[in-house]
Amino acid sequence: MKEAKIENIDFGNALSERYLAYALSTIMSRSLPDVRDGLKPVHRRLLYAMLQLRLEPNSGYKKCARVVGDVIGKYHPHGDVAVYDTLVRLAQHFSLRYPLIDGQGNFGSIDGDNAAAMRYTESRMTEICMLLMKDIDKDTVDFRSTYDDSDLEPVIMPASFPNLLANGSEGIAVGMATNIPPHNLHELCDALLYLIDNPQAGVNDIMNFIKGPDFPTGGIIIDQTKVINAAYTTGRGSFRVRSRWEKEELSYGTYQIVVTEIPYQVQKSKLIEQIAILLKDKKIPLISSIRDESTDIIRLVIEPRDRSCDPQIVMESLFKLTNLESRIQLNMNVIGSNNVPRVMNIVEILQEFLVHRQNIITRRSTYLLNKIKQRLEILKVLKIVYLNLDEIIEIIRREDEPKTIIMERFKISEIQVEVILNTRLRALQKLEEHAIIDEHSNLQKQQAILEKILKNHKELWKIVKKEIKSVQTQFGLNTIIGARRTSFEEVDLTNQVIDITAFITKEPITIICSKMGWIRLLKGHNTDLSTIKYKEGDAEKFIIEAYTTDKILIISSKGRFFTLLADNISKGKGTAVSIKLLVDIGNNDITNILVYKPYQLLLLASSIGKGFLVNSNEVIAQTKAGKQIMNIPEGYACITCLPVNGNSIACINESRRLLIFNINEIPEMKKGQGVVLQRFKNAKLLDIKIFNKEDGLSWNDGKKIQLEKNIVAFLGKRGSAGTLPPIGFPKNNRFSS
């Protein structure tokens, strides 16, 4: 028994070396496809095993268990489940744009159902799969030993069509991943033909032929052309894909929405479940139900809540909330012909394929030329035999060593003599001179053509173009499998604004916010608030009647505005939540809470005595962080935000000075500190009231509403100091107690 050898090595170095070996194995032998044939090793071994089993399109099917057994036994020493899953995917028409395997039996569904066990299903190769391995028996590719040195397997497939782009690929390796969507083969062929004639073509030139991905499940790509082109230029990006739908008119003016195509790699059953959950949670109130009427084709029927619902708005809400709109990633990270993985752009991938085809045709031509030369040598011998048949037969019968004598007599090689001696007498007697001459002539013509191809690059590229055109004809846009399935429709998502309130049922509500910042929502108006309980030391501060479709404006003491959808506020008497969980108000106080009304003028004022008017449309915040509107100096606060519903404004400060002036003296601004409303020293502005001058000035003294009709003494210009308020004005210097 051999004695074990122990070495002292650095643990970190040993670990890194082994991890690197594992990473390289994962990248090169498992996860990333080869740019030339678009296959990973497991795909290549599976298809080659099927070729060895003669599972051609015109042959019978064989059990998948037999195929998987051959693959794991001869070529791929891994689990049978992984190999069978690969086989199943290559047969699924909703997974591959051009399926490589023709499956018979249950191979799963777009609902996410699993395929039947391999002992029940059968398979064979498709026509397009045969194109991947066409001429593999003509020394077009290198072979290497299998894992146990018992057989040989191809290093690469000849690949008569660009399978990498046609069927796409995806995989996750160590530290890198790939995600290539499928494309239309007819368009790829157009791009290849153009690239042959214009080797210096760029991505923008190629994109005149390749519009973008072509998914097996169809759908609509809504990205702009410049976004698509940018993704193919860098080799990285993404595409937004939407479901295809149509409006079906029904009786009595009603209608239903029918979805006929869904995004690539979206499971139909999970999509329906997702919509059903949203329905249950009342997140999409414009629809009443969804049902699946699919057979071999997809048909999802969505019923609107009533016929007044705009189908476009209904679908926009579903696109926003569900996988009816999905994002497909693009990461063209592949193993190049030099066995180095890298991200390529669309032109580089096509160029690699063309170089591969050039090499394949060169090797095939060399192989065929050698075969022709060998056959010509044999025909030369057969002609000699035909002309000297009796003499040769006599030598064979009479001489002990006929081989040497025939070589010397007819000046032929040892190999040629072996042909004569290994040919049966009956075959020699049936030789016909004209047949030998015709075959010799035909072979010489073929030899001349092959030699011309090998010597002249232009002739070689003619053959490449001819074979690409042949594939293009076979899978053209006028064929069932070749017709483009995914269409394009530019939708500018940056400017697209969906009115979320259109999806909410309009109901009356009452919003209550306490002094400590706890907010809750009660159903209805004129609600009995006596039963509402607050924490010790807390009490109600704001009570607002609104509707579930309203937007609520929250103004902080630092002049920042926050926007909430009324329907998003917690419902119920016992479900108050802190305002800090809904908006990022921090430790600042709430100055006011208002119901948003479009184009309404609001008056903002700070304790420093400044203020301005702002349009309500300018204060809507799109994020939880809010929007800063009024700039407040340190030590001061925003004291009020009021809707402008009068022609005059009254200001009262700590020095107990009251000033009334026309509201038109205050400018409208979008943001800032504002202008001086009332001038004072060593004091702060405490309160403001907007009213109509004709009605007089009113205030609440804690007992009843007081009204002062004669306000002439308090009138002035904006920025004045003001005078003492009327007798009976509250001592706290506020218009409401």
From Swiss-Prot:
Compartments (UniProt record): Cell membrane
Residues covered by the Topo IIA-type catalytic domain: 32-496
Topology with respect to the bilayer: Peripheral membrane protein
One Gene Ontology molecular-function label: DNA binding
PROSITE patterns in the record: TOPO_IIA
One GO term describing the cellular component: extrinsic component of plasma membrane
Catalytic residue positions: 120 (o-(5'-phospho-dna)-tyrosine intermediate)
InterPro entries in UniProt: GyrA/parC_rep (IPR006691), Gyrase/topoIV_suA_C (IPR035516), Topo_IIA-like_dom_sf (IPR013760), Topo_IIA_A/C_ab (IPR013758), Topo_IIA_A_a_sf (IPR013757), Topo_IIA_dom_A (IPR002205), TopoIV_A_Gneg (IPR005742), Type_II_DNA_Topoisomerases (IPR050220)
Catalytic activity: ATP-dependent breakage, passage and rejoining of double-stranded DNA
A biological process term (GO) from this entry: chromosome segregation
Keywords, ordered alphabetically: Cell membrane, DNA-binding, Isomerase, Membrane, Topoisomerase
Gene3D superfamilies referenced in this protein's UniProt entry, alphabetically: 3.30.1360.40, DNA gyrase/topoisomerase IV, subunit A, C-terminal, Topoisomerase II, domain 5, Topoisomerase, domain 3
Chief place where the protein resides: membrane
Protein role: Topoisomerase IV is essential for chromosome segregation. It relaxes supercoiled DNA. Performs the decatenation events required during the replication of a circular DNA molecule.
HAMAP family linked to this entry: ParC_type1
Annotated family: Belongs to the type II topoisomerase GyrA/ParC subunit family. ParC type 1 subfamily.
Quaternary context: Heterotetramer composed of ParC and ParE.
Name of the protein: DNA topoisomerase 4 subunit A
Record organism: Rickettsia typhi (strain ATCC VR-144 / Wilmington)
